């Protein structure tokens, strides 16, 4: 087998593969063997049908096509390896010549068009200068953390006053479209200001006391009438406020591992300081990546982006779960931009990982699986099985490797805050980015 590559542009190649009949012959013989077991001809035992009779029954072209179907991927993979190409899309194959009835041992020639990973040149990325917002944990941050902890152990108490933000109200709801009831529910519990129910409900119930009602207009967001304009009647049947426990030693023992409220407050102060560093680290990480993208030109393959757009908008699964107004010109432009950005990030960080000889340990994969499974609310073992079953194990390794590569760049960056002070992110980088829960999306799924 011989192969040659013509790069049509930095992200697209045409591969010509010449396959000698001697290389194709094993696949032809295997095809005859399989057909001999499938075809029944009187006078011949199963598996003993001569190839000439098989040709008469199905045609020699059929045999060759099946042989090519079986063997072409191996030839294609060999050509990719020989020419050091990484494919990013499904190959488009054209068979230019192959064995025919009148020339049964002719060579085969195929042309394969495919999107490929572009080659980039990395600049000197060490010592990048980044500025982040000045952040310092304050007494207000510490008090907020304490109040949030107290709220988790608070109890709801019925009050005789108008509802305000943060209160819990009990509601009766009725939704009407064109004057006809389409949905109704009673005794719903809702936290005013949480924004987790219908748009407009917070404004409607704020200021209402038990027994009072209001009407507002909204767009239904789910169910059979999703997207419909509706008139909603809401009645408040109870108003409750959260009564917080006293911040004393007894509460500290109930809500934490500490014996005194002083120890608990000191720990919350430490957590607030760590959170400030994490926030600065995340901002610095994002800005380092933005700086790399500014410095490096990455050609983006149109085929890869089009495939992702099709998957996002046109697949049966996407159409089944899409809300009304999902496929708009503005949304397509947004998805396209996100896909292009993700592709550039991936290519750059893969190149950095290669330059830094970044590897991935099994323990790092386990940490990644645990962190991601928590974000999805899944058992880590089930999450790992889901990734493996969907063929995304390679994506997982690549994502961890890219995170480590970005941490390498961040390690050498000079980071200052908006006050001109040097920011020490050694604790943030030293976590291996485990503290990050709002990860930068660097993977473009169609490239794996």
From Swiss-Prot:
A biological-process GO annotation: 'de novo' cotranslational protein folding
Highest taxon of the source?
Answer: Bacteria
Catalysed reactions, as listed in the record? [protein]-peptidylproline (omega=180) = [protein]-peptidylproline (omega=0)
Q: Region Disordered: which residues?
A: 314-334, 424-448
Q: Does the keyword Nuclease apply?
A: no
| Skewed-composition ranges (Acidic residues) | 433-442
* Places the protein is found: Cytoplasm
Record key words, sorted: Cell cycle, Cell division, Chaperone, Cytoplasm, Isomerase, Rotamase
Provide the family line. Answer: Belongs to the FKBP-type PPIase family. Tig subfamily.
Annotated protein name in UniProt: Trigger factor
Organism field: Kocuria rhizophila (strain ATCC 9341 / DSM 348 / NBRC 103217 / DC2201)
Record gene name: tig
